[in-house]
Amino acid sequence: MLRNFLKSRFLAPRGMSCFSQVMNPITGQNSWQERGDDYDYHLEVANAGFGDMLHDWERNQKYFAALRKTIAGMREAGREVHVLDIGTGTGILSMMALAAGADSVTACEAFLPMANCAEKILAANGAGDKVRLIRKRSTEIQVGEDMPRKANLLVAELLDTELIGEGAIGIYNHAHAELLTEDALCIPARARCYAQVAQSPLAAQWNSLKTIANLDGEPLLHPPEQLKSCQGEAALHDVQLSQLPSSAFRPLTDPVEIFQFDFQRKQEREKQRAQLLKLQSKQPGAAELVFYWWDIQLDDGGEILLSCAPYWAHPQLKELAAEKAKDHPLPNVVPWRDHWMQAIYYIPKPLQLLEAGKSFHLSCHHDEYSLWFDAREEAPTKSVRRHTCTCDLHMTYSRSRIGQLNQSPRNKRYLRYLEESIEAEKSNVLVLGNGCLLGLASSALGAASVLLHEPHRFSRRLLESIVKHNQLKNVHFLDKVEELEDSQLAALTHIFAEPYFLNAILPWDNFYFGTLLTKIKDKLPEGVKILPCSARIYALPVEFLDLHKIRAPVGSCEGFDLRLFDEMVERSAEQAVSLVEAQPLWEYPCRALSEPQEVLSVDFSNFGQEHSLKGSIELKHTGICNGVALWVDWKLVEDNSPRSIVSSGPSEPVVPGEFVKWDMFVRQGVHFPRKPKDAVTHLEWSTDFKPLLGELNFSFGQKKL
């Protein structure tokens, strides 16, 4: 969510300041900024993500129910109950265990800011002297030294979207070997993992590079063989799968169980397993990807179930739809959480299934921390190894960037301009940005020369392979714009960018395009065409269904007072969290409360001009403004045609009161008001932009008139 600020540090004595080296994405320069010596602490606290879990009402209720049921059962059997809570966080599960009747509770938390907060929360809830809090990892705990006895009930939340990505296998194995009795019970007791094979041309765009064609459909740039043969990265692509439009994928199988993890058994959980499933396709299609999720049985009897399934496969869909359908679209009736999502795994070589009922084999594998998949017509004769990128594309660019490179409507807007503007054997084009295939396409359109600014090593190597494969003879690469000779600058007819830079997190970080222009503008000829010519930032007040919870205070949870946690996070957020953070808003539904309003306009021919603006947006739909969405519209040329605008925001016109449809291949900026107010009529805003310093600051306030 935040930029990767800390590249190196000068440490200072405690209570003093320190200096951190910060990369400014707009200027492209590193600078030393003074920070409090506890800045790292605040950054870590603000981004720990505990609040999201505490807003997960289903998780909280079902953990509490499982504790009550399990402890009551142990009592009925005449057993004492000694609980170990691994990774206690706020101490919420420890307090639940006490409330459910545990005889003793030992909690461990290795993240010291959280452990210190948990100590205060336990005391505030009357449990300070009843929970033994150990500030260590569970794998460092020794019975007799840290805890008086082995526990016979383990409660923990050690899971992530992949289930095992946070080391659950090793932690459970160690706990059973060193910290738990032979007859210990665990909450959760077991987990089941599911896979569903699907075809999705939309999702496939996040994984492979398509041919770039002109407006008539004739190929301009073909991907080289190394891209076609690359199996991609096996790493999961975690998404809110329920938000993938149903029209965007074709399920080829029903969901199938692929692995079980028994957290309760004394024997070691295997660190590596393989499962080969023979499946039949429900309909014709290409087996391109696997949708993945899991569920957990929190109690030993498997009666208390928590499922992370997308809505179409959720076991409680009918009941949840009956409860929420009036206020929520069907994909949003299932419990929301951002700490456990679903994942897409891309099959290394898509398998064509030409008819319904076609048999094929799905290979499922996991090691201690991750999973991978393959689909083949015949059963593989040997173990399928975890695949890795061999073409530079997947290891250089994010999933969203790969999808953006394939985004046909977006590409056509750029290509329309290039086709109309490039003169064969006359145009000399300077391309600025990372991985700018569209700029490279100007060579295929007949430009006399293309100077391509590409300082990133792997991105450059990828583009060089594309140049070689497509036999482009007039392309020259640059590490720095300062390398350009005066004669080269004087001969330029076009300067082109999308713009896209690898260091960019927020949409306007790509204003680095303007910074590069200022370095050469005094030597440019009159009449040189700059694309895009300008950019506009828009703000839209919205009401999120759920995303605001990642920054919202918790207050109380299942009857326990967690205000001390809220205070800790708020203090840290004020010092370490950007006022605007990046989020892929297509995954997080929100209703528009007004029309978008322009809050900044930047002319790239005069990029150095400073701006200080303020305004007010009238809310035209009733709702709680718990977020402000921001994005950039890039203006390609100065005309009134909507085809001259490439937006990083809504993909369809915004209508107040309706859900916004967002571009799925870029992240937008989001501001979360600290304390959203009821009955607000206006959103007041101000923008302050100092381009030469790379400073772009927003402020927002809610007002009732």
Swiss-Prot record:
Matches recorded under CDD domains: AdoMet_MTases
Top enzyme category: transferase
Cysteine pairs bridged by disulfides in the record: none
Keywords in alphabetical order: Methyltransferase, Repeat, S-adenosyl-L-methionine, Transferase
Pfam family, one: PrmA
Keyword Transferase: yes
PROSITE patterns: SAM_MT_PRMT (PS51678)
Protein name per the record: Protein arginine N-methyltransferase 7
Taxon lineage: Eukaryota, Metazoa, Ecdysozoa, Arthropoda, Hexapoda
